[in-house]
Amino acid sequence: MLAAAIGVRAHTVSLALYRSASRVQRSTARRAVTTRAASNTVATSEKKMTTKKLPKARPLGSAKGPDGKALMVTEVCLGTMTFGVQNTEEDAHAQLDYAVKERGVNFVDTAEMYPVPSSCPGWKPGTTEEYIGTWIEKNPTLRSEIILATKIAGFNPGSETGGNRFVPPKPSADCRLDRESVLMACDASLRRLRTDYIDLYQLHWPDRYAPNFGQSVYDPTKERDAVPIKETVAALGELIAAGKIRHYGLSNETTFGVCEFVRAADELGVPRPVSIQNSFCLLHRTFETELAEACAPSHYDIGLLPWTPLAGGALSGKYLHGKKPAEGRLVKFPAFMQRYLSAPCVEATEAYEAIAKEAGVSLATLSLAWCRTRWYCTSTIIGATTMEQLKENIDAFDADLVTLSDETLKKIDDVHFARRDPCMIPTDAPPRALR
């Protein structure tokens, strides 16, 4: 009963912190709209880039820092999956320097299998973690200033990622979420990251079958034997007890999965997951229903970390109107995230582009700033291949620069309700934007 009471108090404190942060955001929004009433949106141009540091504005779910207080993170998290494919080590360090040192971003996300896509010639799992590790080695005093998150790969038999956990590496090994794999993968990530602890250790995708990565329905014929969730949670509890990780989170999970992980944690006396990293953007808003309820501060208090908030780059508008940018990820890697270039997605993206023009911002800025308005979004994971993209993306989370009006938000919802989650619509048609 004592543990339950403590849990209730923790949830109450976290909800109060969220509401307090929300009040500040609403107050900022009102001031911005009042001072610039002639515009739907307060915006900045690329010519007026800022170096203002962002505040640590949101609690990371139920997580507590070393001081026992809510663990606060910036509303934007630096994603790193292009480090090692489209970005060199020098590029990676420059992005980390800018985001962390100049803009105050205190949240960095990576994974043992990064970079992606793995179809890229020369791909090597773990490269991204290695780049981050060399940056940490160059900036040792900053290690305690950032929340470092990485991920263990889920079910993937005969994978080079699994083989990379061994010393020396093996050509391949199964990726599973059993106890031995969880402990081994964590140790391998610690070595590559050149640190002795990971702030947030996430399960990249489930060990069991679950519809993911564009799959829109659950197919019971695809069910398979899976590692018991209790075994995975117990292993994560061992890592917490050993001081190797401080918190753990889920990724690409369903409402059923979230509930099962919480139940297993409570039965084992292990802390609950504090975050969930799922696909979420203007073209994919399925999180808003059952998952949002389960993860709410008043329930399991699990913060959403949206990945691909720009739909693989499609919500930058770079693939609209017949454009095929040679350096665009969806052009360079034609098997990667093509669902965002389907005809239904292109139609919705064009509608959002029109709203962005009316608001006086880029489509990318609109898409990211919209994520910031969602009460369940703790920190939105951004990725960039150029410094210009990175600066624009971070600026979208500065409320003094970009605040979407109620009118703009209503227009966004109108498009959504007319073209709900278009990336989930099955289609055999070739991507319209790349024909």
Feature annotation, model-predicted:
Residues 1-24:
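N-terminal chloroplast transit peptides
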Residues 39-151, 180, 196, 241:
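N-terminal binding-site loop/beta-alpha segment at the start of enzyme catalytic domains
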Residues 57-62, 116, 206-415, 431-435:
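Beta/alpha (TIM)-barrel catalytic core signal, keyed to glycine-rich beta->alpha loops juxtaposed to Asp/Glu
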Residues 80-90, 167-183, 220-226:
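Active-site mouth loops of central-metabolism enzymes
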Residues 92, 128, 182, 186, ...:
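Aromatic/hydrophobic pocket-lining residues that form the small-molecule binding cavity
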Residues 117-123, 157-176, 209-218:
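Surface-exposed, active-site-proximal loop segments in enzymatic domains
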Residues 178-197:
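An active-site-proximal structural segment forming one wall of the substrate-binding cleft
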Residues 191-214:
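Active-site groove signature of glycoside hydrolases
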